[in-house]
Amino acid sequence: MIQRDIEYSGQYSKDVKLAQKRHKDMNKLKYLMTLLINNTLPLPAVYKDHPLQGSWKGYRDAHVEPDWILIYKLTDKLLRFERTGTHAALFG
């Protein structure tokens, strides 16, 4: 099993607090994060995992819910949780 370092951006922590304030089901986010931490790849199709482009090139986007996404970066040595939120909040 690949062992990666795990990082969380400062903005990610703020995004999580906002999601909690909006009464999002944090267990859904935790489960998706656990899949990534445990290297369960590819992710199940329900997460619609895909690479991002433009200014987010090098990052990936997985759907926690239809309009709740997790942006992360995955390399051989690192898993970085960058942002979470709605499409409008993150890409708008």
UniProtKB/Swiss-Prot annotation:
It holds the Pfam family YafQ_toxin. The keyword Oxidoreductase does not apply. Its EC number is 3.1.-.-. Induction: By the DNA damaging agent mitomycin C. InterPro entries: RelE/ParE_toxin, RelE/ParE_toxin_dom_sf, Toxin_YafQ-like. This is mRNA interferase toxin YafQ. One of its GO terms (biological process) is translational termination. Disruption phenotype: Cells missing yafQ show increased biofilm sensitivity to the antibiotics cefazolin (a beta-lactam inhibitor) and tobramycin (a protein synthesis inhibitor). There is no difference in antibiotic sensitivity in stationary phase planktonic cells. Toxic component of a type II toxin-antitoxin (TA) system. A sequence-specific mRNA endoribonuclease that inhibits translation elongation and induces bacterial stasis. Cleavage occurs between the second and third residue of the Lys codon followed by a G or A (5'AAA(G/A)3'), is reading-frame dependent and occurs within the 5' end of most mRNAs. Ribosome-binding confers the sequence specificity and reading frame-dependence. When overexpressed in liquid media YafQ partially inhibits protein synthesis, with a reduction in growth rate and colony growth rate. The keyword DNA damage does not apply. Belongs to the RelE toxin family. YafQ subfamily. Keywords: DNA-binding, Endonuclease, Hydrolase, Nuclease, Repressor, RNA-binding, Toxin-antitoxin system, Transcription, Transcription regulation.
